[in-house]
From Swiss-Prot:
Residues 113-373 form the GS catalytic domain. The modification Phosphoserine is found at residue 343. Glutamine synthetase that catalyzes the ATP-dependent conversion of glutamate and ammonia to glutamine. Its role depends on tissue localization: in the brain, it regulates the levels of toxic ammonia and converts neurotoxic glutamate to harmless glutamine, whereas in the liver, it is one of the enzymes responsible for the removal of ammonia. Its EC number is 6.3.1.2, 2.3.1.225. It comes from the Eukaryota. This is Glutamine synthetase. It comes from Sus scrofa (Pig). The keyword Secreted does not apply. The modification N-acetylalanine is found at residue 2.
Amino acid sequence: MATSASSHLNKGIKQVYMSLPQGEKVQAMYIWIDGTGEGLRCKTRTLDSEPKCIEELPEWNFDGSSTFQSEGSNSDMYLVPAAMFRDPFRKDPNKLVFCEVFKYNRKPAETNLRHTCKRIMDMVSNQHPWFGMEQEYTLMGTDGHPFGWPSNGFPGPQGPYYCGVGADKAYGRDIVEAHYRACLYAGIKIGGTNAEVMPAQWEFQIGPCEGIDMGDHLWVARFILHRVCEDFGVIATFDPKPIPGNWNGAGCHTNFSTKAMREENGLKYIEEAIEKLSKRHQYHIRAYDPKGGLDNTRRLTGFHETSNINDFSAGVANRGASIRIPRTGGQEKKGYFEDRRPSANCDPFAVTEALIRTCLLNETGDEPFQYKN
């Protein structure tokens, strides 16, 4: 399995320089989503002092013609800070800054789905929507070969790898542990992690997060994972079906509740939400991967713990359904439900916005409603 050339550089030499004092100056790494809707970009600027809140961070710009976001003749795009975290790579007082992207005319870029998501979340803030997203991913070599897999064959069939322990069952735990600790340091609401069903496949959970925080925290957790993998010389892919055949795909199961669902007899509101979702299946399928459902076509086959992409289904503790109600929720008559349809490479802003539109704003039909400002 191939690893990157950069990972073979002497990290001890780098540490000599990273341990130098930086005075009062602060490095702020600005992060944004590029024109693919999946890729992340970043660049760093120096600040004169440590910012205490997002309002203290300046706007910036970048060349959108190099990120699939504009033409060269009018390429400047604006970076508007939206969320700030501690930097686990450069450490305090340095920052990671997640940004929204705006075009030259100050309109949101096509892949800036945070902008409308924030408006929708503000409309239902009194219902306190909580989300938790289960991000699955697969570790690969730079040659595209799954991490730890035999070079000329396949590992043993699925079965022993889920939550597995041992060198023959857990592939790449060092990366998982490094990512987990880096997220905790950064202030990401990471809930846990586990090895998944396919060897070299892992999962981390983000949440519970209220409203717009869900997308901010998951995107920055993804960024941190990519940076950790960069240090180890490997790749983390969010492809929903990285290996064809009898291997599990990768999803981003999304858990959702409102204040009413979490309180006594909240199961009534959970069931009402599921009924609304059942009538808007195709709208959600289009929102749940960046290619309008094409990526999920490879994953949602009705096999490997998935539902069929063409059918809506729901059930208690049923991992072959579109929507799963956890057994505890069925017993306690309150809690949350899990939408198992989002793909691993989904945009969490698109997913959470779609859930709010259908379940709380009572939208119907195949298109989102256009609200007036």
